[in-house]
């Protein structure tokens, strides 16, 4: 993969909390997954969580492109179904499960006990703010750099992501906001993709 513009900036950014906001086919999910993989390879033994709010979406829409990235990089992962994580050859782990609890009384049950260096939430506009705040507390794995990545579709201006956590002016310390469009990812798409989408929408 080739990264350009704001996606390239995102890929090398080490800010603790990063919001890469973009529309359909802007490449944000792919870039985030490759960023996780780069972290796993650079820091053997690091633990990440990659997820969507829904477990079904995590398994059907996030796990496959993650596995594809690993395969392209020549990394053969071992799936541990008991704890829901992929283990890379160097001992790094990427947990892959949704955050939504079936029982609201156990809203944070999936997260409690996890010790992570990195968290990635795709489609983060679906994530309730209280779950986001709970996730922040999971960044505690000793000896590794910590980072929280989010890739939402553009939310409403009153959404907690835009209003409280990631203002466009980037005025919050240790928080970085990026906005990308499909044109920032045009070099990774077939020539007919953008014209087809423009015609459809």
Question: What are these model-predicted stretches?
Answer:
Residues 1-201:
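Phosphate/NTP-binding elements of NTP-utilizing enzymes
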